[in-house]
C-alpha cells in the first residue's frame, strides 16, 4: 500500500497530501466513536487525504473475530454510508480502493519477507495468524463491497499480483 502511494503520487507537491496509516485504535481513539479518528483527518478543501487502512477495519476484524454483535456491525455499515455521503455533500471526492492480492502471491511475499534481510522489517508474527483466516476475511470483504458500494463512494477492486499493473490501475482511476 505504501509503495502504491509513493509511485502514484510521485511528483505531486507533498504539501497538498497527507497519508494516514491506521492500525489498532489507540487508547485515545477507542474513547470515541469508530469514525472519529478518520473524521479528524478528512481533507481540507483542495487537499488530499490518503487512508492506509480505514474504518472498514472496524467491520472486518470484529466480524471475523466475532467480538461485536451482528446488529452493531449492520449499523456500522449505515454509519459509513452516511459518513461518506456527508463527505461528498461537502465537496470531498471519496475514492475507495481494495488492493487485492491472491492467496498464492501473499504466501510468496510473506516468504520473501522472512528470507530477504532487507524485507525482514515488514514481517509480523500476526501475518500468519491472519492468513489462516483468509477465507473468512474474503467473505466479509464481499459483504463490505455489497453494502458500501455507492454512487457517491464506489469501490475500485485492484488486482495487485503484478505491481506495475496495480500502480497503473490506481493512477488511471484517480
Where are these regions (language model features)?
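Glycine-rich phosphate-binding P-loop
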Residues: 1-9
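Loop/turn-to-beta-strand initiation segments
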Residues: 18, 45-48, 91-95, 154
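A glycine- and Lys/Arg-enriched "phosphate-lid" helix/loop adjacent to the NTP-binding pocket
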Residues: 61-79, 87-139
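NTP-dependent small-molecule kinase module
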Residues: 139-174
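Conserved nucleotide-sensing/catalytic segment adjacent to the nucleotide-binding pocket
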Residues: 14-77
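Switch/connector loops and helix/strand junctions flanking conserved nucleotide-binding motifs
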Residues: 28-31, 57-63, 103-110, 165-168
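Conserved catalytic network of the ASCE P-loop NTPase/AAA+ motor domain
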Residues: 12-14, 28, 40-44, 86-92, ...
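Residue-level signature of catalytic and energy-coupling elements of molecular machines
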Residues: 50, 97, 158
Amino acid at each position: 500500500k505504501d509503495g502504491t502511494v509513493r509511485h502514484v503520487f510521485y511528483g505531486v507537491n507533498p504539501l497538498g497530501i497527507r497519508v494516514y496509516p491506521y492500525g489498532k485504535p489507540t487508547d485515545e481513539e477507542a474513547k470515541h466513536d469508530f469514525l472519529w479518528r478518520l473524521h479528524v483527518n478528512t481533507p481540507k478543501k483542495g487537499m488530499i487525504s490518503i487512508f492506509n487502512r480505514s474504518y472498514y477495519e472496524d467491520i472486518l476484524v470484529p466480524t471475523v473475530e466475532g467480538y461485536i454483535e451482528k446488529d452493531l456491525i449492520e449499523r456500522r455499515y449505515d454509519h459509513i454510508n452516511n459518513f461518506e455521503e456527508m463527505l461528498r455533500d461537502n465537496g470531498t471526492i471519496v475514492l475507495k480502493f481494495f488492493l487485492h492480492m491472491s492467496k498464492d502471491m501473499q504466501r510468496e511475499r510473506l516468504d520473501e519477507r522472512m528470507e530477504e534481510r532487507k524485507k525482514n522489517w515488514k514481517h509480523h508474527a500476526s501475518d500468519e495468524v491472519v492468513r489462516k483466516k483468509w477465507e473468512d476475511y474474503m467473505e466479509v470483504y464481499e459483504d463490505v463491497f455489497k453494502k458500501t458500494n455507492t454512487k457517491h463512494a464506489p469501490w475500485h477492486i485492484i488486482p495487485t499480483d503484478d505491481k506495475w499493473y496495480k500502480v497503473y490501475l490506481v493512477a488511471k482511476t484517480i
